[in-house]
């Protein structure tokens, strides 16, 4: 989080706001293993909230890369996605998480989204 805050400070004009929360289907504290994202193995607690709890509007694009937590994130974002109809770019590792991918596809289709394009492990979904 603080790395991104530092990077964002370089830009004098920005429409980006950073919050120190993980996204889920409910408010809770989760244990996170950071060894896949930093050079040394590290663990820590992350406060989680739903995307819907922020009451965001005018969202055009959502990028999701949460390594297996896509289903809780999408379930906690249903209202936001329905009200804003953003383009969704979601990392889906089909070779490693077939059950998660199937559930994500079901949620996205239920919300009126249609698969558009795949590049490596990222997929683009648009409101149909």
Please place each PLM-identified region on the residue numbering.
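Phosphate/nucleotide-binding beta-alpha loop and adjacent structural elements of enzyme active sites
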Residues: 1-128
